[in-house]
């Protein structure tokens, strides 16, 4: 029998069954002696094997994760994505599950869109009747005459057109030498609603801080939900968190609409934000973990577009309802119907999470239901699918343990580096968005519609832009481009600040001034560009974070990233808290941080067409490709050819 010599290169990282078997047979020559390796193996065959290895390294892109997960080795274990295809779970059943995961995003978007209109300050003035003394509605000082009272009332009537709750003491409404409004306030109405909580409890002037407090608490509710509900999602499952939070959103929203004081409204709004964050986090995880690498971007953008549709839908519902309490019930009470998601076999748990947690029987049941949905009614699964399900534990080998301590997490520095960069990028992308306000963002109904439609429209355009470019140029490259455009828009707007506040404002404000019109057009253009690019950066940083965080800690890691994004939204209430003072300095700081993000993004790995990491070891291998050093043309084998004994000899 002719001897066989192993010429293959073992798979790195201790593949365990993933060794490339390139053994060749060495035949004896005519004189009975064994020839050389060059005589037995043709040069073309060795060159073909090297080309195949080079193609495998090229697909990996020099990335550690790509070399360990993307290289297809037949004897090795199947990935979860390959298991989905082998079982037949990709198809109509998968699309139905993804659709069920996208539907709750609509109500999350409705809840987010409600806060700006619920806290919008309506035009107001002090209620007064005719002009006899002490009947103007303002408190009269001790030494004021009746003539001064009438004159002051007329001045108040003229000044009432510009009053807002952001005035520190409503001095723009108060007549000279008068203190404060003794009677009720008259409100001229809101763009879409007749009244809101501000008009019901007169949260203006000295009580205006309660409105800003409500905005801050609502945002902190989202941040707390993202941060604290990530651990239960990793510990008890994604499905349970989604069902629990969806079931509580309805009672919380109805209770907030029935609250009898502003304090009760603020407390329930905080709880509502907490629950909506849990819904958003849970369904995002379930959508992402059910897709193969080619579907992840489309599914993520589909969820974002559903959210954009929710913002547009909210404007229509507000125009129909007119009352803020009825509108609150309308957007939250239907969430109680999501309790039907608890019906067995309808809304399924993440099979990827079940496999990582070693719940094999539950994972088999979920995969079987997904596969049966893709087949005609009554048709059995194929033999290959049945074998894959029965041998699931051996097909997808599990880690030694799925539990770990916090101290062990500190050893995975690469995971923490990716979390830090993406969290910082997401924070800046959300925080700087408030600085991009086009000219004319006042309190009139047309300005309100302009700002609302502009924010939603740029988000939709960002989704279209990402869908066209990301799969072609990669996640990291488009994220770098988005943050670069954000930084450019901020720097240009800061340069236009001096033109907006010139030395001679009287000459500048003249009607028909071409320089003034040109400046307003430039501010509007770069504001739209900044909104567009910051929306794209926020969407892509969240997706990239979900793709580099391992399944075992994906709920906690992604929750941290999304919580930082929610905290970035505090820049708006913080600026209103100081009545707009310091807006220029805030924009300067955020623009500098955006430039820092550009440098940090180059340290991130590329996840395009890569498998999701399952355990911490896989997440630690998510490293950036080399910027200067190219991968070698072939993988060098430093092991001597005959170093390993061959049992065939």
Swiss-Prot record:
Residues glycosylated per entry: 134, 143
Subcellular location as annotated: Cell membrane; Vacuole membrane
Transmembrane stretches, start-end: 211-231, 240-260, 265-285, 300-320, 330-350, 414-433, 448-468, 477-497, 526-546, 557-577, 584-604
Top-level taxon of origin: Eukaryota
MF annotations from Gene Ontology: transmembrane signaling receptor activity; transmembrane transporter activity
Biological process annotations from GO: intracellular iron ion homeostasis; siderophore transport
Region (Disordered): 1-70
Tissue: Expressed in brain.
Membrane topology of the entry: Multi-pass membrane protein
Protein name: Solute carrier family 22 member 17
Originating gene: SLC22A17
């Amino acid at each position: 029998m002719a001897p066989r010599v192993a010429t293959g290169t073992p798979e790195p990282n201790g593949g365990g069954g993933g060794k490339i078997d390139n053994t060749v047979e060495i035949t004896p020559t005519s004189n009975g002696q064994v020839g050389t390796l060059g005589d037995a193996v043709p040069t073309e065959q060795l060159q073909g094997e090297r080309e195949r290895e080079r193609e495998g390294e090229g697909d990996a892109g020099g990335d550690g994760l790509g070399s360990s997960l993307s290289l297809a080795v037949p004897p090795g274990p199947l990935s979860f994505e390959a298991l989905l295809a082998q079982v037949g779970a990709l198809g109509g059943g998968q699309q139905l599950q993804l659709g069920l995961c996208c539907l709750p995003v609509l109500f999350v978007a409705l809840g987010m869109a409600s806060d700006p209109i619920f806290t919008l300050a309506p035009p107001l003035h002090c209620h007064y009747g005719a002009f006899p003394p002490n009947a103007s509605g303002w408190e009269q000082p001790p030494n004021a005459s009746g003539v001064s009272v009438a004159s002051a009332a007329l001045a108040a009537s003229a000044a009432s057109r510009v009053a807002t709750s952001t005035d520190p003491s409503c001095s723009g409404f108060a007549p000279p030498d008068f203190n404060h409004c003794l009677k009720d306030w008259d409100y001229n109405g809101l763009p879409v609603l007749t009244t809101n909580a501000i008009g019901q409890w007169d949260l203006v002037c000295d009580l205006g801080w309660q409105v800003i407090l409500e905005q801050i608490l609502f945002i902190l509710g989202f941040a707390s939900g993202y941060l604290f509900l990530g651990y239960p999602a990793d510990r008890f499952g994604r499905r349970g968190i989604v069902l629990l939070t969806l079931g509580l959103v309805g009672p919380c929203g109805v209770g907030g609409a029935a609250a009898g004081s502003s304090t009760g409204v603020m407390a329930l709004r905080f709880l509502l934000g907490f629950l909506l964050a849990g819904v958003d986090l849970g369904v995002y995880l379930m959508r992402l973990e059910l897709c193969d690498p080619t579907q992840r971007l489309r599914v993520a953008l589909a969820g974002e577009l559903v959210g954009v549709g929710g913002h547009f839908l909210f404007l229509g519902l507000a125009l129909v309802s007119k009352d803020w309490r009825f509108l609150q019930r309308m957007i939250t009470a239907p969430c109680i119907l999501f309790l039907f998601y608890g019906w067995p076999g309808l809304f399924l748990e993440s099979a990827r999470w079940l496999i990582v947690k070693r719940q094999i029987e539950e994972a088999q049941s979920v995969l079987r239901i997904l596969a049966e949905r893709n087949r005609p009614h009554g048709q059995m699964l194929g033999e290959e699918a049945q074998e894959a399900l029965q041998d699931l534990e051996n097909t997808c080998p599990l880690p030694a343990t799925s539990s770990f301590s916090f101290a062990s997490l500190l050893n995975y520095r690469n995971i923490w580096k990716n979390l830090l960069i993406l969290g910082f990028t997401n924070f800046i992308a959300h925080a700087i968005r408030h600085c991009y306000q086009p000219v004319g963002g006042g309190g009139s109904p047309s300005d309100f519609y302009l700002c609302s439609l502009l924010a939603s429209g740029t988000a939709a355009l960002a989704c279209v832009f990402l869908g066209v470019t990301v799969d072609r140029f990669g996640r990291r490259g488009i994220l770098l481009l988005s943050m670069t455009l954000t930084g450019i828009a901020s720097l240009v707007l800061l340069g236009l600040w001096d033109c907006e506040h010139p030395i001679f404002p009287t000459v500048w404000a003249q009607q028909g001034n071409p320089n003034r019109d040109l400046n307003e057009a430039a501010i509007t253009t770069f504001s739209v560009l900044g909104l567009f690019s910051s929306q794209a950066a926020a969407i892509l940083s969240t997706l990239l974070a979900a793709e580099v965080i391992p399944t075992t800690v994906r709920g906690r890691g992604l929750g941290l990233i999304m919580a930082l994004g929610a905290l970035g939204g505090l820049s708006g209430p913080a600026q209103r808290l100081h009545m707009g003072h310091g807006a220029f300095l805030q924009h300067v700081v955020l623009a500098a941080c955006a430039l820092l993000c550009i440098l940090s993004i180059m340290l991130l790995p590329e996840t395009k067409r890569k498998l999701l990491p399952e355990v911490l070891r896989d997440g630690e291998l998510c490293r950036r490709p080399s910027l200067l050093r190219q991968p070698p043309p072939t993988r060098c084998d430093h092991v001597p050819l005959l170093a390993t004994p061959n049992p065939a000899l």
